[in-house]
Amino acid sequence: MKASDTVGRQTATRSVWESRALKNESGLLALMREAVRNSTTVCVLSGANTWRSRWVKYEIARAVIEERGLLAIQVDDVEPNRATPERPGLNPLHVMGLYQHENGHYYLVERHEVVKDLSTGALGFEWRLYADHPEPLVPPRYVGDIEMGRAAPLSLFTAEHDFLTEDGATNMAAWIDDAAAQVGR
């Protein structure tokens, strides 16, 4: 089934996810697993701070592990009640990646903010093993070559779109279909 054939998609606001997280982490995980059951693609709607969310990273990781299509859509400037749009945040697919160990196995990794210069307080990023899935995995078919001993962000292998400048209302279903096709679905 193509995204363009789907009617009545279920959406959830941030408050639904956050309230579930505050009550019970296992309840939130169950809600998330049910929400994406039978999906072919995970479409990350990216705002100013989406890249920081543990739960967004979790769903990205599940998409990689389950070999589902993956894409990001910037929605920073879509909010109609905001007088000025937020500055675009990092693409969450840029802070999640895959690492190819010298033994040939692939692992999920995530970027963590670290202080790079104590005298100036300058921040940078470093790759660390993704704690919620430290086991090796088979990379999805859309992942290209990764040099052994190196990490590569998922954004190198996936599409990123801007909802407003690329007419997301018209094109989003096609973007999702393209991401699904990358994994043969």
Tell me the role of every PLM-derived stretch.
Residues 1-38, 162-185:
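Conserved N-terminal substructure of TIR/SEFIR domains
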Residues 22, 29, 46-53:
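Short, charged/polar micro-motifs that form catalytic or ligand-binding hotspots
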Residues 39-44:
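Inter-motif core of Ras-like GTPase G domains
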Residues 49-65, 81-85:
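Conserved TIR/SEFIR loop-to-helix hotspot centered on a Trp-containing motif
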Residues 66-70:
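A short helix->loop->beta-strand "cap" motif at the edges of active sites that frequently abuts
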Residues 73-75:
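Generic beta-sheet signal
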Residues 77-79:
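Conserved nucleotide-binding/hydrolysis micro-motifs of P-loop NTPases
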Residues 81-185:
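C-terminal interaction surface of TIR/SEFIR-family domains
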